[in-house]
Amino acid sequence: MSQEPRIKLVVTGDDFGYCPHRDKGIVDCFHAKAITNVSLIINGSSAASAASLAQRYNIPIGLHANLSEGFPVCTELKQNSSLINGQGVFHGKMGIRKMLSQGLLDMSEVRKELCAQIKLFCELTGINPQHMDSHQHVHVLPGIREVFAQVLEEHRIHFTRIPVELGLHRCTWLPDTLMEFYKGVEEDALNAIEVFRSHRIRWPELYIGLSTMGKNMSTYNIQEAIRYGVCSWQSTIATLPDITNSVSIELMTHPGYPSIPEDGGCGEGPDDFSQSLDRLHELEVLKSTSLQSFFLGNGVQLCTFRDL
């Protein structure tokens, strides 16, 4: 990749605050310079201690808005709200999408919950979120994306995530059901672009993380995702004047030491994703000398959102 433009890579550790084991792994990755940034899940069981860790170690931190797992933060919405089911918890990754498709979500309640999560984030960290994305990509869903963009602009949060991974169609190792979900996420994300732009929200030019999650994370897969993304980006901007010869990328990651039963989660205990050894696998790949050598030898500069 010697002929490629300079690459600025934000490596985000998602789900910070989900449980102490995950948090320790994320902090270890930060100390190893394997991630540059974390995204705090504010209704996670260890959100307060995670925020303290970020302050102690000066870890750049944003908000991982959560409307799909666990309990709401907004007190007003804990008892009777379109955002929760009969057990008082959010509807889940697919459940919120079903509720939305049926027109059953009250967007004024979405606004209240997002604002409550930002308020709690500021109370715990002492700062405004440096960026704001979401758990399970709900921020790009129709209806929610408009409210999300308005809330970010009002709170002067300038960066978000657009989960569109160039080259995803080439990833034949992904199961059909997962690929179908990812394609839906990408379609929603593409439709969110103009909404976010209209509210002066920014994001890195490229995104990686769908094809490299869990057991699918490897130095090779990350290399190939970067190579394909950069080549596609170069082709797109080749005919445009006054484009700088650098490109920014966000790599979404979920490293950590696996959760143990009954310890962690967002009020319902840790899910299978968090208890999986895939979390440890991601940690080991991110810290590997092979990946770090690839970055060093190919003009990849690790950075934070503030560096963009």
UniProtKB/Swiss-Prot annotation:
Mg(2+) binds at D15, H135. One of its GO terms (biological process) is carbohydrate metabolic process. PANTHER family: CARBOHYDRATE DEACETYLASE (PTHR31609:SF1), YDJC DEACETYLASE FAMILY MEMBER (PTHR31609). Its cofactor is Mg(2+). The gene is ydjc. Signal peptide: none annotated. One of its GO terms (molecular function) is hydrolase activity. It comes from Xenopus tropicalis. Probably catalyzes the deacetylation of acetylated carbohydrates an important step in the degradation of oligosaccharides. It is an enzyme of class 3 (hydrolase). Its EC number is 3.5.1.-. The keyword Metal-binding applies. Keywords: Carbohydrate metabolism, Hydrolase, Magnesium, Metal-binding. The active site is at D14 (proton acceptor). This is Carbohydrate deacetylase. Belongs to the YdjC deacetylase family.
